[in-house]
């Protein structure tokens, strides 16, 4: 039975709001199972609430239940097809190494970028997925777009250097890794990738 408020009217929406707040608190506290339970209770009242479906997907994603997360992102997107975050998060699930569905992830990031063109986060994820499927030049294009406005973003500089390494352009890659090391001398990842590029360049020279 839906409870009554002080005026005697039913509090259907208040019940959903209360359950949703409990779920969000559980999410914040790291208790995703409890969040899912509260979201399920809220969805019994409002089964087509896109926000509830989206938040349930987030909890499943945090639990590494990627198939379930994708299912609920899809349900949310059928109701609210303009949810930028749902496309990005669905893409993150698909591009997780355990899923290894980079082409499908690319479609999600492209949909997200149609909604918010040139968003740095979506561009970065698109670039990473392009690199993962061997489309290195397109990946570099994504990273370049970010670097136009964030020229000192070291993670993006590293990703561009890595894509250049994959293309066999080791001299250029090393220059990008050196740029990172100028900004962050203790960046171990840049050191490691630079050494790998140097080793690859030496192997190519000896062949």
Name what the model sees in each region.
Residues 13-51, 55-64, 95:
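Alpha-helical segment of the N-proximal tetratricopeptide repeat
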Residues 28-38, 62-75, 97-111, 132-145, ...:
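Structural signature of tandem alpha-helical TPR/SEL1-like repeats
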Residues 16, 50-51, 84-85, 120-121, ...:
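Helix-start (N-cap) detector for alpha-helical repeat units in TPR-like alpha-solenoids
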Residues 2-18:
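TPR-adjacent "capping" and linker segments in tetratricopeptide-repeat scaffold/adaptor proteins
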Residues 10, 41-44, 74-78, 110-114, ...:
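Conserved structural position within tetratricopeptide repeats
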